[in-house]
UniProtKB/Swiss-Prot annotation:
The gene is cbiD. It comes from Geobacillus thermodenitrificans (strain NG80-2). This is Cobalt-precorrin-5B C(1)-methyltransferase. The keyword tRNA processing does not apply. Belongs to the CbiD family. It is an enzyme of class 2 (transferase). SUPFAM superfamilies: CbiD-like (SSF111342). Its EC number is 2.1.1.195. GO terms for biological process: anaerobic cobalamin biosynthetic process; methylation. It catalyses: Co-precorrin-5B + S-adenosyl-L-methionine = Co-precorrin-6A + S-adenosyl-L-homocysteine. Keywords: Cobalamin biosynthesis, Methyltransferase, S-adenosyl-L-methionine, Transferase. Pathway: Cofactor biosynthesis; adenosylcobalamin biosynthesis; cob(II)yrinate a,c-diamide from sirohydrochlorin (anaerobic route): step 6/10. One of its GO terms (molecular function) is cobalt-precorrin-5B C1-methyltransferase activity.
Amino acid sequence: METKKTLREGYTTGLCAAAATKAALTALITGQVQTDATIRIPIGRVVTFSLASCSFDGETATASVVKDGGDDPDATHGALIVSTVSWASSPGVHIDGGEGVGRVTKPGLPVPVGEAAINPVPRQMIHEAVNEVLAQYGLHRGVNVVISVPGGEEIAKKTLNPRLGIMGGISILGTRGIVVPFSTAAYRASIVQALQVAKANGCRHVVITTGGRSEKYAMQEYPHLPEEAFIEMGDFVGFTLKQCKRLGIKMVSMVGMMGKFSKVAQGVMMVHSKSAPVDFGFLAALAEQAGASSALVAAVRGANTAAQVGDMMQEAGCMKFFELLCEACCQAALHEVGGGLTVATSIYTMNGQQLGKAVQTDGDDEVDRCGC
């Protein structure tokens, strides 16, 4: 019997920055090169990092840690997280970003516009690391900390940072200190952050898509909307819709393809391939309602995939089916959130042909739907 492999956890950029800061400040105080740094993470565990480098010149000290994403590496896996510390002329811990750390240019993020994209928990971890070292050596001095990531501007192109208005590099992130492999919580958090940025930048209409290809087609369908209005929800349809309503976003357009939206139409709001099977009986009933022949309805009932059903309907010229499917998606979405939104659904082929579209309103929303 095959033994299931235990996935290895990684560490956040925020924890790496705090560890590098602790080592750099220790080197500045002691005048000794450090080889490692031990730090307590937010969830209570203690972790020791081996340093990639450590140096000092009397006025400043620098230490670095290689970011290890564990068995769920992201774009920042392998990046060098560098902390440079120096004594400040004023009390307190003064944190800024250097090369390769982004700067916030749009509202809606947990860091104010104009500041380095170092999130609140990493800032707290850096503060605690500095204060721990100062207390250890009985010092009461202000400290400057600059976090940098060589190559961070290039790495950031593989992330959502440009869309979120974080320019010039990556973000220093993390709430727990560790990276849990294939964590759905992390993906959900990224959806919430993207929606908050959209709302803060005045978007009353957002477009949520199941992936990069559907987002490309969505941008072609809604060219009048700003980039931050487009959000990849992945499989988290219900979660994303509820967050839209919570944030007071009035118009939500869903754009995707047959496979996942066939599930949404059934009321399945987590559309991972393993979450729930496609109900071919449901699709057959829609086909019958759309005027398909009895033979075609039977073929739909016996189909293997939703994409196959889509091909059958296209070949038969039964395009009413797709309109009904989009209507069912809108109804399921409104039911999921308890109404109060305007919801549009567009279904595309893999090659970008729009198969169907529907718009439904539930509530007294006054949304300009001319571009829907």
